[in-house]
Amino acid sequence: MAITHLYGLIGFPLGHSFSKKYFTEKFGNLGLSQTHAYEQFPIPTIEEFKGIIAANPNLRGLNVTIPYKQAVMPLLDEIDLAAAQIGAVNTIKIAEDGYTRGYNTDYWGFRTTVEFWDKFKNFESLKACVLGQGGAAKAIIVALQDLGFEVIKVSRQASEETVSYEELPDLMEEIGLIVNTTPLGMFPKVDDKPPIPYELLNKQHYLYDIVYNPLETAFLSTGLENKVGGIYSGLEMLHGQADKAWEIWQKKLS
C-alpha cells in the first residue's frame, strides 16, 4: 500500500531529533503504518524548503526545528495568528495543492507542562528568566506572560530588551524560574551548560530545560547540587507540542 500521508522534520542538523521515532510509533498505534510515514529532511539552507514540498506531493505536514523556526516564515503561504504574534513557526500544515500554513505548538507544549508541574504552586516568585533568544524562546516568553510571569530575557549581549549573563547575579534574588532554551548541554556536548551564577541558586529557584537528550542536563544536575526547588526536563514539552501538531495536521485547511 502506498504512503499517502507523509510528514517530516526540517532543520539542521537533525541527529538530536526524537520526532521520527515518536510519530512512527504513533502511526503504528493508530493502525496507520501502511499509509502514513515520517521522514527527516536535514537541509543546510532554508532555500531548500520549497524543493522538499515540490519533490514530495504526498507531504501533508512538517515540524520545524533549529535553526529555521523564524527563517521559514516568509516562505509560507499563510501564518496562524498566534504564530505570527509569537514570531516563530514550528509546525506546518500542507494541503494537497501544496498550500502551506504555519503554526506554533511550542507554546502549548511549554505552557501545559508548567501549568501541570506539581511544583508550580510552590513558586515564591512569578519572575522568570529565559536563556536564549531563538524561535523556541519566543513561544516560551509568550506562554510565561500568559501565565502571569514577568519575563527577563537573557542573551550573550545586553540590549534594550535583554540583559547579559554578566548582569544575572544582581537579579537572582528576584527570579523564581529559569528556562534554558539554548542547545547548551545537548548530546554529544553533555558537559556544556549556560553561564548562569549557579552558586547563587537556592530553593526559591526552579529550573526548566527544553533540551531532552540527556533527560538530566548539566544545567539541571548543577541546579540539584545547589538545592533548587525543582527541575523539569524538556521531554514532556516535546510530547505536548508533537501531539498538538498531530491535531493540527488532522484538520482540513479552511
Regions of interest found by a model, annotated:
Residues 120-127, 201-203:
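Short helix-loop-beta connector
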Residues 112, 116, 228-253:
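Active-site capping/gating segments
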Residues 137-138, 216:
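N-terminal Rossmann-fold NAD(P) dinucleotide-binding loop
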Residues 2-117, 222:
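Phosphate/diphosphate ligand-binding glycine-rich loop within oxidoreductases
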Residues 146-164:
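NAD(P)-binding Rossmann-fold cofactor-contacting core
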Residues 12, 132-134:
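Glycine-rich Rossmann-fold phosphate-binding loop(s) that bind the pyrophosphate
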